[in-house]
Every structure is written in C-alpha cells, then in structure tokens.
Amino acid sequence: MKNCLIKPTLVLVCLALLALPLFAQRGKGGSGGGGGGGSTGCALVSPPTVSSSTAIAGGESVGIFSKVTNCSSGKARYTVTISAVSSCGEETILASSVISFSAGQSFLISKAYSVPANTCKGMGAVYVSAYSGSTMLATGSVALNVQ
C-alpha cells in the first residue's frame, strides 16, 4: 500500500519541479528587452542633427545628436545604435548601447564622429536607431555631405 502512494507522489513532485522554469518564463516579456516575449515595445527617435555646416571634409570631426523616447506604458530595454553610411554604401557602426527606460522616459544621445580621411566623397547619411532584440522599432537619419 505504501508503494501505491509513494510512487505517484514522487511523479507529481518531479513534474512540478520540471514545470517551475516554464511558469517563471511567463512572468518575463513585457515591452522591450531582448529575447522572447510577445510584445516588442514602442520607441521614438527624433531626427538626428549634426554640428557641421552643410559639408565636411574627410579627416574632420562632427557631433551627432538625437533623442530616443520609450513610448510604451512600461519599463523597457532598447539597443540604441548610431551608424554612418558613406556615399559608397559602406556602413560604420559608431556606437551601440543597451539603455533601460522607464515608461515615457527620453534620453539625449550624442556621439563625436571623426570622418575618416579616405571616406568616399559625396552625400552620405548618419542614422540613429532603436531596437528591441533584433526588431527595429524606430530610426532617424540626417544627410552628411563629405567633400
């Protein structure tokens, strides 16, 4: 009689212990952050501005400024990247950071960029983008004329 009670009890305890990680995963997710979760979040990126005049020479530096806002109603973690694309189509990632936002919170983003002397001359662009995991939520760009 003891075996009839002990074996089913052990099976139930083992199943409960195995199911605990699955229940813990359900609490994760929400908006933002990397990994699973059904919701991707909400971000706004203001169009970036640059500190140069209309044209910049290779070898000179320029300042890049933008604002990134969490437009979701909860906390979120977004990856914010700043990149430059030359007129030849070569992309350079200038900065990439994971930033934790509260609901409605904004951050001002700035980066100094030394344009390489051998950069292709012509109209390029600077991009500021916000990602939740691998999903791009928002991006802003500004033209950068290299002469």
Question: Each PLM stretch: what is its role?
Answer:
Residues 11-19:
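Bacterial N-terminal signal peptides
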Residues 50-56, 98:
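Short beta-strand segments of immunoglobulin-like
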Residues 69-74:
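Short solvent-exposed strand-capping/beta-turn motif centered on an Asx-Ser/Thr pair
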Residues 44-46, 85-97, 119:
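Short beta-strand and strand-turn-strand segments in soluble, beta-rich domains
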Residues 25-40:
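Ser/Thr/Gly/Pro-rich low-complexity, disordered linker/stalk segments of secreted
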Residues 1-11:
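Bacterial N-terminal signal peptides that target proteins for export
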Residues 103-112:
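Aromatic sugar-binding surface patches on proteins
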Residues 114-120:
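Short, surface-exposed loop/turn segments at beta-strand-coil junctions that are enriched for proline
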